[in-house]
Design a protein with these regions (language model features):
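Terminal targeting signals and extreme-terminal segments of soluble enzymes
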Residues: 1-156
Length: 156
């Protein structure tokens, strides 16, 4: 997804994320970590992933960073879905609680993010990560900065 191009086209955050899903063109982080955006609506985003041994830590379970990345993506895209074409966001803080370990047998896993509140400069979101049986594996709260996107200079 080329956010800058979509911004120039005047697409809202929700329209940008919907276009990403239709084009089946995930950002590189999704390919690297093996997860995909499967649902998007205003204020809500759902990702699905299949953790495998490539994301294991030294003790034989999925590294916490995998769960944190999914939760951060779910929170961020929930916020992105409510932004105008001329707005961007970035995570300021992510607090993750790990409830149970993940292994490759846990998948597919599902991260669902929701907006708690959004203002002109800050947004607050939460997300849950559940395993194939619907058990809570991790949860997160996030504070995100909302900012205006600069328009690229046009050439004459």
């Amino acid at each position: 997804m080329d956010v800058l191009r979509n911004n120039q086209a005047g697409l809202s955050g929700l329209a940008q994320l919907q276009a990403l899903m239709v084009a089946n063109s995930p950002p590189p982080i999704n390919e690297t970590m093996g997860f995909v955006l499967i649902e998007i609506e205003e204020g809500r985003a759902v990702f699905e992933g299949n953790p495998d041994r490539s994301v294991y830590n030294p003790i034989g379970s999925v590294h916490g960073g995998y769960a944190a990345t999914l939760l951060d993506s779910a929170c961020g895209c929930a916020v992105h879905s409510k932004l105008a074409a001329d707005q961007g966001y970035t995570t300021l803080e992510l607090k993750v609680a790990y409830h149970r370990p993940l292994t490759e047998a846990s998948g597919p896993v599902r991260a669902e993010g929701r907006i708690l509140s959004i203002g002109r400069r800050a947004a607050f979101a939460e997300a849950t990560l559940t395993d194939r049986d619907g058990r809570l594996c991790a949860s997160a709260t996030s504070t995100l900065l909302v900012f205006p996107l600069e328009r690229p200079a046009t050439t004459a």
